[in-house]
């Protein structure tokens, strides 16, 4: 029974970490350099994360400064940002890119909350798939007479209880993110 608990905690813990990681790249009321985690630059024929070819800083609440380590990449970085789904317009002064980030409109905030909700739902589905996988494993063990019917019932109840815990955790993370996004 402990093997199920450990396996469930490991797999569902990874789902929660994945959700938190995806939420870092969503734009909120606050400017965050993690917005650029999914921006890739063509660096000598390789798609390279922007964070590996430039320093990204947030000197002011609504300003992002991107300083490439190799100045020849400035135009490629600018193009990568323009081609991304961030809806940002960088301005170049020859050595750094500056991006003035406008305040999000209510409509845009609502769109981002919908996007966050979909991400949370996808992670809840992943959690339920893990539950399904572990339930099947336990049922197979009972069928093969490795565990008793009472043990099976206990294991299934434990798996369901832990699944409910992780689903509530995902809902809580979503609620916090939605509140953060809607903050003006």
UniProtKB/Swiss-Prot annotation:
An MF annotation (GO) of this entry: ribosomal large subunit binding
Xref: CDD domains: RRF (cd00520)
Keywords, sorted A to Z: Cytoplasm, Protein biosynthesis
Protein name: Ribosome-recycling factor
A Pfam cross-reference name: RRF
Domain of life: Bacteria
Family: Belongs to the RRF family.
Lineage, broadest ranks: Bacteria, Pseudomonadati, Spirochaetota, Spirochaetia, Spirochaetales
Originating organism: Borrelia duttonii (strain Ly)
């Amino acid at each position: 029974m402990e093997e199920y608990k450990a396996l469930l905690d490991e797999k569902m813990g990874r789902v929660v970490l994945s959700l938190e990681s995806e939420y870092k790249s969503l734009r909120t009321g606050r400017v965050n350099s993690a917005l650029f985690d999914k921006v890739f630059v063509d660096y000598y024929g390789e798609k390279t994360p922007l964070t590996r070819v430039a320093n990204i800083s947030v000197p002011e609440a609504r300003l992002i400064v991107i300083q490439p380590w190799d100045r020849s990449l400035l135009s490629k970085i600018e193009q990568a940002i323009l081609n991304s789904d961030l809806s940002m317009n960088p301005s170049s002064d020859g050595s750094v890119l500056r991006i003035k980030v406008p305040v999000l409109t209510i409509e845009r905030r609502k769109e981002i909350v919908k996007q966050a909700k979909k991400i949370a739902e996808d992670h809840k589905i992943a959690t339920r798939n893990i539950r399904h996988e572990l339930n099947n494993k336990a049922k197979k063990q009972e069928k093969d007479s490795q565990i008793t019917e009472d043990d099976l019932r206990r294991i299934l109840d434990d798996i369901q209880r832990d699944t409910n815990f992780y689903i509530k955790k995902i809902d809580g993370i979503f609620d916090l993110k939605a509140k953060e996004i809607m903050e003006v």
